[in-house]
Amino acid sequence: MTGKTQTSNITNKNDPKSINSRVFIGNLNTAIVKKVDIEAIFSKYGKIVGCSVHKGYAFVQYMSERHARAAVAGENARVIAGQPLDINMAGEPKPYRPKPGSKRPLSALYRLESKEPFLSVGGYVFDYDYYRDDFYNRLFDYHGRVPPPPRAVIPLKRPRVAVTTTRRGKGVFSMKGGSRSTVGGSSSSGSKLKSDELQTIKKELTQIKTKIDSLLGRLEKIEKQQKAEAEAQKKQLEESIELIQDECVSENADHSTEEPAEGGQEADGGEMTDGVEEDFDEDGGHELFLQIK
């Protein structure tokens, strides 16, 4: 698809004639379809004086309104590049179709003349943003957009109806605030549960604290006992060392006293024997002397 002549890119003139002869092309696959292709398709309905292509949509400006309406009637819902086109008159208001999650009011399509009189056309001005947003909404619809999952509906309890009869037989209905009571009961029960949980946590913490204190006390006792035992062993060892030293000193003293006593006895014995021998010699000599005589 190729166009014969190159047209202008201006499609945003605000005069009534231009707006009424302008065509909006939505759901357009602009990645494949180019400006020359659009001109080739829509030029058969009349002379095109302007064509502007944007991301996902385009505008075609005709010379007359009759040509624009013929293009809308002939090309709307045509499938190009795998997507059905959404073609409308750009200068006419469209019926607003609310979408899920969309809160754009119908007044967003047009603005009053008093706000922007220089863009007014018959009391209103055209809003290009609306066409762009509406185009993207319909684009998701064509591709089978899955609607968001419905919110879980919480069944509400029906309020109890108490029938009180009077003597005349007329029934007087009184509605009890069941929903209020349920809400109040749920809040009170929730606060009660929280307080109970806090109490249980407090008890558990106190139990843990007592256990830790008892363990610390036991450790202190064990440390004291071990320290006392170590001191006793050290004292006993010192006493045994002192006893051994005393015994060694006493033994040395005994040996030193015994040695001089033994030396004196030996000297006396020698002297005694020497005297006896002398006496014996003297006596023996005397006897021998007598015998010789």
UniProtKB/Swiss-Prot annotation:
One of its GO terms (cellular component) is nucleoplasm. It comes from the Eukaryota. Residues 21-92 form the RRM domain. Residues 176-192 have a biased composition (Low complexity). Residues 171-195, 236-293 are annotated as: Disordered. The keyword Lipid metabolism does not apply. Residues 239-249, 268-284 have a biased composition (Acidic residues). This is RNA-binding Raly-like protein. It comes from Mus musculus (Mouse).
